[in-house]
A protein has these predicted regions:
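Alpha-helical interface subdomain recognition
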Residues: 1-85, 107-110, 119, 123, ...
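A structural signal for short hydrophobic beta-strand segments in well-ordered beta-sheet cores
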Residues: 145-148
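Short Ser/Thr-interspersed hydrophobic loop/turn segments at strand-loop and sheet-helix junctions
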Residues: 54, 79-84, 177, 193-197, ...
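Hydrophobic, small-residue-rich alpha-helical packing segments that form membrane-like cores
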Residues: 136-139, 155
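Long, acidic (Asp/Glu-rich), low-complexity accessory segments flanking structured domains
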Residues: 220-239
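A short core secondary-structure module
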Residues: 154, 158-201
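N-terminal glycine-rich flavin-associated loop
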Residues: 88-111, 137, 151
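Flexible, small-/acidic-enriched active-site or ligand-binding loops
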Residues: 142, 196-225
Length: 396
């Protein structure tokens, strides 16, 4: 199913359809001309272009010049779906602007919002979300970085963060550290830290199979005003989970965009490639692969936009729905893209061919913002928790 067909679903209103149509036209006219060779420059160029085009307004609330009253998850998902179909780095640039500011939008003071959101909205500043550590990725409660009091109005952050998207080019980081109010998850707090703060350094740039700016950060006595805290003391886990609750569905949307493009490339290839004197598409095994991919694309779209719609209707949390969307869409996209590579034959593993690029792009999505295995645990726990609640009600 194409995006146009998806937009006919009742999940969307006319505002979503206008946004999608405008972004798609802009992307088709703009993205191909942006630089690709220098990774940092390419990412900066995409942030600037998205800001100038007005599309980063989707990651900022209306009170600070944004597009919607709050963070409209359907709009965020549509943007990632559309951008991923065309250019993985553009999807990344959009997504990280949102992930690196959502915590500020949701939990920041009026002063923090006024300071950090407008530059991101306009593409003048680059945002980042610094959660993962060498020994704490999906297990957020195991974070070891500390933020200790330094006088009455400051804290000092010490520790290491790794796998930080936009690391090395960001203007600010949303950083999570242990402040010690309680053991485990309840002892974390979140802060906005400017990239040029003394003691904050990039200790390593990390190269991955689908290149994007990624780094390990070192915090050595990084002095941060207490006013830069997001939420209250000990609210860090809540801040992280609320942010991921919004953006986890959008990871599924990016996977959906990659899968849509792979299916498009597969259909075009199967129709035009001659094999044994006839189009590849006439072989039943080819038709079976196309049918499986098309079904998985549609199922992914339903899960992604169901989760986004549910959140936008006012649900406090969509933990189960977002986990299902991310888990299914990323795993399905891997299968869809793998079939596309196979049906392209030798071209499928040739650098510069679109399906080869997609094969590298999709792999990380099954890991970041909660690996597939973690999503399975989350889904099961949500179901078991709900069952326990119903059992208690039945016993009364």
């Amino acid at each position: 199913m194409s995006l146009d067909e998806t937009l006919s679903w009742p999940f969307f209103d006319d505002g979503h359809r206008r946004f999608a149509e405008t972004l798609a036209r802009w992307a088709d006219a703009t993205l191909a001309a942006l630089p690709h060779d220098d990774l940092d420059a390419a990412c900066r160029a995409r942030v600037k272009a998205l800001g100038e085009g007005g599309f980063l307004k989707a990651v900022v609330p209306a009170e600070h010049g944004g597009l919607n009253r709050g963070l409209d998850v359907r709009t965020l998902c549509l943007a990632r779906d559309i951008l991923a179909f065309r250019d993985g780095l553009s999807d990344f640039a959009f997504a990280m602007q949102g992930l690196g500011t959502a915590s500020i939008s949701l939990f920041g003071s009026a002063a923090l919002k006024a300071r950090y959101l407008p530059p991101v909205r306009d593409g003048r500043a680059i945002a980042a979300f610094a959660l993962s550590e060498p020994e704490a990725g999906s297990d957020v409660a195991a974070l070891a970085a500390t933020a200790k009091p330094d006088g009455s109005a400051h804290l000092r952050i010490d520790g290491t963060k790794t796998w930080i998207s936009n690391g090395g080019i960001a203007d600010h980081y949303v950083v999570f550290a242990r402040t010690g109010e309680a053991a485990g998850a309840r002892g974390l707090s979140a802060f906005v830290v400017d990239a040029d703060t003394p003691g904050l350094s990039v200790s390593e740039r990390i190269a991955v199979i689908a290149p994007h700016p990624l780094a390990k950060l070192r915090f050595e006595g990084v002095r941060v005003p207490l006013a830069n805290r997001l939420g209250g003391p000990g609210d860090g886990f809540k801040v992280a989970m609320a942010t991921l609750d919004v953006f986890r569905s959008t990871v599924g949307a990016a996977a959906l965009g990659f899968a849509r493009r792979a299916l498009h490339e597969t259909v075009e290839r199967a129709a035009s490639r001659k094999l044994f004197g006839a189009p590849l598409a006439e072989l039943q095994l080819t038709q079976g692969a196309i049918a499986e991919s098309a079904s998985e694309v549609d199922a992914s779209a339903l899960l992604v936009y169901r989760a986004a719609w549910t959140k936008d209707q006012g649900a406090a949390r969509v933990t189960r729905e977002a986990a299902m969307a991310k888990m299914f869409a990323t795993e399905a996209a891997q299968r869809v893209i793998d079939r596309a590579v196979q049906l392209h034959g030798g071209l499928g593993i040739t650098k510069g061919v679109k399906v080869e690029e997609l094969y590298r792009e999709i792999r990380a999505l099954r890991i970041y913002e909660g690996a597939t295995e973690v999503q399975k645990v989350v889904i099961a726990r949500e179901l078991l928790k709900n069952r326990s609640g119903k059992s208690a009600l039945a016993a009364e």
